[in-house]
């Protein structure tokens, strides 16, 4: 638990450095701009598609028969937003992971772990594959759990759990791939998966805090890099794996 809090705290101190501040806001702003632009051009098409999807359900027929057509219309808007919100999150996190993580890892390693040997256990293809798996699983779980969103069941919990999964799955590979060997990478995943998920939950909470949510993608990259490199250093100090 201490190493999780330590990584979380160091992420906040690191993000204040000018090099990191320059990276912070634009992933979320770029994601918002992209999806709002797409919504501007395709909102009518998306609404028609969602309306047709809902119209085929038994619940929609029952609501319309009993004079609750407005509920159906609001359900269309709600479902579209519930699909749009994770797309914005995925896009912002992907921008940070793909374009900014090399800079983040280099910054953290130079300032905090200058003597840590690079054993390059990861590959470019491995990073791409990891990102694809993370996004597909996250999107699939979000879609599968949509009925729970509409019923209100687990609404406070689901976003945290899903965002935590995306955070830890996406950032852990890039945080470790340059410095950890393949054996060290596997050892860290086996022994620290729970702590990485906890770190993912703590970072997911930032998306609910105004202004901090703009920094969340870069803070996530910093936190997982601090956590990962500290674990690599600890393994080598103990002569493991």
Please name every model-derived segment.
Residues 1-138, 142, 182-183, 187, ...:
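Helix-coil boundary and N-terminal low-complexity module in membrane systems
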Residues 17, 153, 193-194:
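Amphipathic alpha-helical protein-protein interaction surfaces
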Residues 75-106, 149-177, 211-235:
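Selective recognition of hydrophobic, aromatic-rich stretches within alpha-helical transmembrane segments
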Residues 137-150, 207-211, 215:
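Alpha-helical transmembrane segments and their membrane-interface junctions
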Residues 168-196, 200-201:
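Hydrophobic alpha-helical transmembrane segments and adjacent short intramembrane/lumenal linkers
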Residues 193-222:
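Terminal membrane-proximal soluble interaction domains of membrane-associated proteins
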